[in-house]
Amino acid sequence: MRSSLSFVGFMGSGKTSIGKRISLFFNIPFLDLDEYIEKKLKKSISDIFIEKGEEYFRNIETESLREAFSLYPKIVLSTGGGVVLREENRRILREKSKVIYLKGEFENLMKHLENKEEHEKRPLLKKGREELYNLWKKRLPLYESCADIIVEVDNKDIDEITFEIIERLRDD
């Protein structure tokens, strides 16, 4: 595999879990962008949203995205679900990596997020279901616009998804 990989998709699609497995398989460093931001600011994403607002977070996210690609010559990067909202971020992802979009239907993604622990980690889950659906719908074309590879995650377990990605990367 010649380039870095970035995983995009809505929350609950498996970006971090699958990214870690792909990282191990190809022996390339893994970085979760949200975790990187939390360590950098010494605050949870939820607290950053509450204390500073989404615009502040999105600025830090763009800055951190640039840093991630400059820190590692080759990386497997798991992004936050909203990273694609900024054209600049989509451009950085496309220029610096092969982008894999983990695509899932809204109801299936929500099933992955039903436990309380997820609600505490993800500030957007505090929004109503209709608002989340609208976010998902708004982001779909943005994910697709920057994706080199689109992988359907519905009705597949993590092993099936990981294997499919490895096969598709080998074919590249």
UniProtKB/Swiss-Prot annotation:
Catalytic activity: shikimate + ATP = 3-phosphoshikimate + ADP + H(+)
PROSITE patterns (alphabetical): SHIKIMATE_KINASE
Free-text comment on the cofactor: Binds 1 Mg(2+) ion per subunit.
CDD domains, A to Z: SK (cd00464)
Binding site for Mg(2+): 16
Annotated residues for binding of substrate: 34, 58, 81, 139
A molecular function GO annotation: ATP binding
Cofactor(s) for this UniProt protein: Mg(2+)
Any one GO cellular component localisation term in the record: cytosol
Pathway: Metabolic intermediate biosynthesis; chorismate biosynthesis; chorismate from D-erythrose 4-phosphate and phosphoenolpyruvate: step 5/7
Entries under InterPro entries matching the protein: P-loop_NTPase, Shikimate/glucono_kinase, Shikimate_kinase/TSH1, Shikimate_kinase_CS
Location of this chain's protein in the cell: Cytoplasm
GO process annotations (BP): amino acid biosynthetic process; aromatic amino acid family biosynthetic process; chorismate biosynthetic process
Positions annotated to bind ATP: 12-17, 122
Principal place of residence: cytoplasm
Assigned protein family: Belongs to the shikimate kinase family.
Function summary: Catalyzes the specific phosphorylation of the 3-hydroxyl group of shikimic acid using ATP as a cosubstrate.
Quaternary context: Monomer.
Protein name as annotated: Shikimate kinase
Source organism of the structure: Dictyoglomus turgidum (strain DSM 6724 / Z-1310)
